[in-house]
């Protein structure tokens, strides 16, 4: 038995047909975009359901043939071989349908606020933070996404002490959300004369870009300070108070922004980041309260959790959450093979979700 929710699948097929019918009539521009987007999301599931039902019917015909005592031995052998192949195909389709029916993260389609901070390791940590940012930047380009740097504090020898960027593209959060955590690098610094391997770290935070309707921020909960922007050495770099610091009093979250000469633009950027951080903090609190659910996740999303090691001497990348090692570090750092890690993490997360629903992977 497949244990698929046939009634629910019937409703989805009917809804898909209704959307296709709407496109044949006169549709407003906004509705056209909405309908085509929804169809593109439903198409893989609908195709899998139709294929599954065709295979199910074919298997029924084969069973009838095998139960018929008049079926000759040669025909029976052919039917049994075809049944085995169709059985395997049916199981694949059932798994596809179950995965497609898993509850979606409401934020999966959102843009991303990507924050990378150098951790332990001094200058090497800053250089590694720069490597990570370029890795995500190249990966984003391969996905057809855009990356806009919101704020950056450069390291003394290169890289970044901290960099915040907005990654814009459909499904950005779904792809990048498992990247949050501590990334560790092991390599020989250029300044190391004895050839010793140094270990450094950088912290990555991937936050969904949230809108005002997603987070209720009361004006009375904000403390807003303005000041003159400062350069690397602490000197004031302009005469107007364009820098802004916003403190969310209930949570203690502070965002400082001074990259633009416009106070208005700095304030808007700071509020965007603040909303994402408040939303993320609330999600962290909810996840912590749901200990049973948290165990089924690929990592907890805890910013202090070491999730991945990049070992340059061995040319390997190891993701500790799923014990996956790829000996293609240059391709991962170039953004080209990062998708292999992300896909493996996504699959593991889906397997855990299916197991929680009582389905074997």
From Swiss-Prot:
Compartments, record wording: Cytoplasm
Modification N5-methylglutamine occurs at: 235
Pfam families per UniProt: PCRF, RF-1
PTM field: Methylated by PrmC. Methylation increases the termination efficiency of RF1.
Annotated stretches, region: Disordered: 286-305
MF (Gene Ontology): translation release factor activity, codon specific
UniProt keyword terms in alphabetical order: Cytoplasm, Methylation, Protein biosynthesis
Keyword Plastid: no
InterPro entries: PCRF (IPR005139), Pep_chain_release_fac_I (IPR000352), Pep_chain_release_fac_I_sf (IPR045853), Prokaryotic/Mito_RF (IPR050057), RF-1 (IPR004373)
Any one of the GO CC terms: cytoplasm
Family indicated by similarity: Belongs to the prokaryotic/mitochondrial release factor family.
NCBIfam families linked: prfA, PRK00591.1
Function: Peptide chain release factor 1 directs the termination of translation in response to the peptide chain termination codons UAG and UAA.
Name the UniProt record assigns to this protein: Peptide chain release factor 1
Provenance organism: Rhodopseudomonas palustris (strain HaA2)
Gene (UniProt): prfA
